[in-house]
């Protein structure tokens, strides 16, 4: 639960916070296709974890901030296939926004995630970066909305929509 830009409470049940004024947005996640990547023979060597970039999002009214990205690493011989496959899932963030381009994205410390935790990407793998669904939460927090219900990474909305049904062959 976020109030005036600050996380004030962590909850597993939010039903009592909803009323007829509540508006919801469900944001897709690249985590949705992780299982399919492994099934296709494209297992991530590392990830996912989240890093904050220096790339500004297009501001709209009080909403402004930088993009967060999800990082995964893959063996170099899998990168083109992973890129092509994930491009068919635009509602799950689609293709990566970059490969091995942390400096271009404004990521200063290659091995520290958004929460300040160290991580290690295996040597000889390529880092791929996807736009991350935590970005809207960051931007909304910076707007200091009086009240917002958000998710915590790793604790997102789960639906009965099969990931395979999100595949768009013409993308």
Language-model segments: which ranges?
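Conserved mixed alpha/beta catalytic, RNA-binding, or beta-rich assembly cores of soluble enzyme
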Residues: 1-119, 149-150, 155
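C-terminal functional extensions of proteins
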Residues: 120-171
